[in-house]
């Protein structure tokens, strides 16, 4: 079997290792930390999980493309996801809503969000419904498109259907020009105006950055994996080792040894050399 040495047991390194093992390669991963995950990590502090990475994972519903992608490696039916009712709460500084609250709730459910905003500002109905529609339009397109291998004729038919994504490019081009500041200016309600100005801590950001996650939150396609980021990474590491892969923890790589313009081995701690046919670097730095 061809031997591949992988640098880094983060999500990319672990997933690459899984696919290589499934396709007949012999692999081993070298990780300088003593746990898997890389930047996909979390800590337990008493009853709390401190998680600075995966606030949500795309693919928590069975109908999405990401669900099918993750399912090639993990059994998602055995993983519990939590779907939050409220995405974020924005504390408005200078105004209040008609109930006297200075908190603007961004609900994950689009119907709930629309009704909430219409209740706060009926006079902004046109702007609110256009805002919600911009998010709903994105839901009409599967991202990424499912591209399973098909026979010739069905493949041609699918290719013709994929032409509808040309319209999607036009939608993206339109939405990428509108920022939260631009949208805020359209509201008559001082409360909604200020809330959208503060959508990204007062920074001006394109609404496309907001709309994409909102579209998947509404469909419950982006849930939080119970257990946190480290538990998620550990599941992938367990899958990798079950496929026959090896992980060397606490083993920083000192050098990639090359010969005739090709990678031939890794020099790791204690000056141990691990020979291979190729090296795949999945380290950020």
Each language-model region and where it sits:
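A structural preference for short, hydrophobic beta-strand core positions in alpha/beta folds
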Residues: 29, 247-249
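Well-ordered beta-strand scaffold positions
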Residues: 48, 95, 252, 271-272
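Extended, hydrophobic alpha-helical segments in both membrane/secreted and soluble proteins
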Residues: 11-16, 232-236, 240, 249-253, ...
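Core beta-strand elements of the Rossmann-like FAD/NAD(P) dinucleotide-binding domain
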Residues: 2, 268-278, 282
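N-terminal glycine-rich phosphate/pyrophosphate-binding loop and immediately adjacent elements
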Residues: 2-143
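Active-site/ligand-binding neighborhood in enzyme catalytic cores
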Residues: 136-243, 250
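Short glycine-/small-residue-rich Rossmann-like dinucleotide-binding loops
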Residues: 54, 284-285
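A conserved short coil-to-beta-strand element within the FAD-binding core of flavoproteins
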Residues: 249-264
